[in-house]
């Protein structure tokens, strides 16, 4: 009973925007983070397993791997950190295996920290004594398989194991799944090298273990993207995402993100985007930049929003390597 009560205190705390399960909603791909998180139909990359694994079938590369770091919600409290590793291997663009893992750290918890909302208390609302200070940790491990049907369509299924630990208090475990589709149609008759794509995904539906009250942030997303080469070494990609997030709690929201990426000389990328949401979400803008040198790509993004948005002034950094081309 005590364990269930403590869990309820944590899940109902309104001052923390990213609870144990909500780290799954943070986009670890810095490239699309700079495009207002419009990612379900964009060009596939190392982080496709978190966005739309089927898009990896249409990548120019047969193998990509990447690492990203996101110091999250610094305006709320220091100590929220997301680290992610992702990649894929494509078998002649007919089959692909995508993989990834995420580590999400929250600020240190201590019963003596009176200004922190996650103070563990008993049924009488008294702080529980004898509990050592600790940093909550959430981890996910992802594995996806994608299959290409014909020239234009790819399908994927992703399995995800999630574990959130609150020290000696309790541990939550869950298993989630994604199902996604990605289609790309070339527009060579209109412009050589141009294409249009569409994507759809249902993410993070599944079940929990250990009779926990874990609430997976199930989401349905659809989107489209247009890629157009400009001159010899320049290109433009514009993307839009529509998403509806559903959970059994009151945390339901609808949002739309629009993002643009301009690449100069196939080396320097400039990105921007804006996301709008209903009354249950937040509006925000993003900017980003990228630099590619040989097989190494470095990216940066920054999120700006009104003071009420806990994600404002968040930046993300990433480096990843393309190890094998066609």
Description of each model-found segment:
Residues 4-13:
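Sec-dependent N-terminal signal peptides
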Residues 19-324:
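Subset of outer-membrane beta-barrel
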